[in-house]
Amino acid sequence: MDVLLSLPQPELFKTTVIPFLANRNIIKSEAILSNLHSIFYVAIFYHIWFLFGKWILFPHLVKWKLDYDQKHNVKKDEKTTSERQAQHYKKKYTSLINQSSVHLISLLQSIVVLYYSLKFLLDPKASAEPYQTSHSRVFTENRDTQVICIFAIGYFVWDIYISTMYSTFPFVVHGIISTVVFCIGLKPYIQYYAPVFLMFELSNPSLNFRWFGIKFLPQKSKFCSLLLLLNNLTLMVVFFAARIAWGWFQIGKLCYDFYQVRNEPGFLVFDTIVILAGNFVLDILNVIWFSTMVSVAAKVLKKGESVDKVTKNEQ
């Protein structure tokens, strides 16, 4: 992944893009301007993997799954014409390929940002010793946290495009807000907290494994149902630890840091409001999502419904 950061800046960026953005004060941060080409490369990297999934990895897998479902699970409706059935099959085939490719990139990016974030956070010399004060946590920047912001922004820029093409408006908004938040981090402003809040991504692998399990594993298999159950339990534990316990603790710490530096010259009121509002909304949503997980788990335990039946009802 480091090779993406070492690629040279395209001539178009040097002569046209960066001067245009800088001269019109569209982007004032030198850190963002100097890393704009790396953000572009990261976005392209994710899109190449998306195209790999869409055209190479998933077509045969999706065809096998749909044919398997037709043979074992789906009762044919005699009133439905073969033409309508073919149209429905094609629509489902295309949709599943696209969504599978999106989830592949979601899984890939979580691995990438977790690698860089954990590498930073688990090194006391990098993440603890230089950040003993509120001032350092809000205003300090270094290449490690800068790189984390670059990979996050590159992914969310790609996410805006892909959500516009294949998803719904709320996902586009999520991508825009996330891009803005990490651009604020790259400015730099609270750059230290970029890897801290990316610990939310610890729940992402289990979330994507769950999606792939529901879509591709034989639901009548007891072994596959057990795998889904174990993954769901892992998801709940990690989700609570990373997004609820860790998330609320860190937003409290961030509020304290902002309060401590509120009178310093570099304190940015608007950026602070955007970051706090975005994080509070996300933390509240995490509580709502976790309560939904708990209610589904309770339904499985109390009513004895199988995991696959419950997850089908969720879709």
UniProtKB/Swiss-Prot annotation:
GO terms for cellular component: endoplasmic reticulum; endoplasmic reticulum membrane. The keyword Cytoplasm does not apply. Residues 95-302 form the TLC domain. Present with 1920 molecules/cell in log phase SD medium. The chain crosses the membrane at residues 39-59, 102-122, 145-165, 171-190, 226-246, 265-285. Pfam families: TRAM_LAG1_CLN8. PROSITE patterns: TLC. It is a multi-pass membrane protein. This is Uncharacterized TLC domain-containing protein YPR114W. The keyword Nucleotide-binding does not apply. InterPro entries: TLC-dom, TLCD. It comes from the Eukaryota. Keywords: Endoplasmic reticulum, Membrane, Transmembrane, Transmembrane helix. Residues 60-101, 166-170, 247-264 are lumenal. It is found in: Endoplasmic reticulum membrane.
